[in-house]
Amino acid sequence: MHRRSTLFLEPSRRAGFILGFCLCPVLGTWAQTNAAPGQAPSNAPAPMHHHAQPEAGDCAGTDLKCATAVTPAFDAHNNLWVAWVAGGAVSVARSTDLGRTFTDATIIGRYGELIDVGADAKPQLAIDAQGRAVVAYGVFKDKAYDAQVWIARSASIWAKEGPGFGAPRSLSSDPASQRFPVLAFTSNGRLFAAWLDKRTVALARKQGRAQAGAALAYAWSDDAGATFSGETIAQDDTCECCRLALAFDARRQPVMVFRAIYDEHERDPAVIVLSSDGKPALQRRVAEDHWVIDGCPHHGPSVAVTADGALHAAWFTQGNARQGLFYARSENHGQNFSDPIPIGIAARQPGRPSLLASGNNLWLAWKEFDGTHIYIKERHSSDAGRHWTNERIVAETDHAADHPVLIAHDGAVFLSWTTRDQGYRLIQLEAT
């Protein structure tokens, strides 16, 4: 007999309470009705300023201090860029001192309550070696939580007049719902984007068939996001409300871990590898957790690839086989994974994993909550996940907090984290 979980979650608002943030009042409503909604960004060069500490309950504006979700990226000039959602707007800013100070924000677009601020709905930010940048995020289209993925592009974030992001436009040409984009540049400059897509679900409905979840869709760009081609459905039966995790292998092939739907009701982690011709080369179940759930977990996985070719996955589950946060590795490119290893203190609700590989060094960060404090913990492996250090606390707060994000630059590894009381922080991690 399967143990069945039931979650009664509204994908945007209620998920924010699980996230740990107060869901702040937002500014305005949909401001424009043309094909590229959103306020035109300010492209004037901006002065640097200190990132002020937010006051308790001060979360109504669009500033970084009010952010509910922050995504970092480094450029080739050693600048740190962050994209975030706050006050119903998507914004970006630059730091030249590892996050201690930031320029004034460039607002990509304002959407009011339509912006997707669900627990797994971080804005995406990718920057190539030439200083071209792309931001992607989701915006709801209706009360049924159908959404559209918007992208905004800068031809040069180093331009004297400012980063110059153009008007946002739809990533996909299909009118069906799309959510939870991920995007990244390969080492040779191609831009890969993937998202959860409802076009096959809509088609099944028209044909009188029921189809659970969403499809995993992807496309490529050879001009840094100016255009995308090869829009493809990789597979159906994907959990429609959990983020995708993306990495590239040594052959620059996309490796994604996501929550797949098995036997109509089980939602367990899966891996898919896309071959050089753009077609799925492999799809496997990472672990048989047998999480039977009538609802949306809003809790996506993480993935990394070490220099030895091993694939690494971390995920949260409440399955019949196991419950909590787990890690596993594959030495045969995803054909099989090791037995899942539990991560963190089970009584403290460990979750929200972030994996990062640098050579054969591997880091894993996650979030725990003891009823009063939120902790970010990490472990490190110097041999591609075969052996790990003991866990240690990197940061903590007793206020609302974003999920941890690990990022590497110039040989160093950092934890990117924002909290309501301490603001944005970039914390360097030392291999122990």
Give the role of each language-model region.
Residues 34-432:
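Extracellular, repeat-based ectodomains that mediate carbohydrate processing or recognition
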Residues 1-11:
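N-terminal secretory signal peptides that target proteins for export/translocation
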Residues 10, 22, 37-38:
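Intrinsically disordered and other compositionally biased segments
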Residues 2-3, 31-34:
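N-terminal acidic, proline/glycine-rich, low-complexity intrinsically disordered segments
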Residues 15-29:
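Bacterial N-terminal signal peptides
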Residues 14-15, 154:
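Hydrophobic alpha-helical segments, especially transmembrane helices
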